[in-house]
């Protein structure tokens, strides 16, 4: 079964750059789980985000994410795993923030 893992962390932690030890941990995670990881990436900070809504046929664009929270969506993985717990159990970012696990919908 496929799951989308949404990694939420406080992006202020990265304002002065990424900790080399954490980067190595993510690289090791990626290498160890390469057969399960189908895709993923880190995201630019929320200052680069835009929210788009279409109302009455017109696109309305606002700067930033929809919600203001202490933790922001910082990255994602698309993985193959037997269940939700197995999907997110070893994500390094779970120690600093949280990982939302969403099953991928299949259409037959």
Question: Can you annotate each of these PLM segments?
Answer:
Residues 1-108:
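Conserved, structured core segments of small domains
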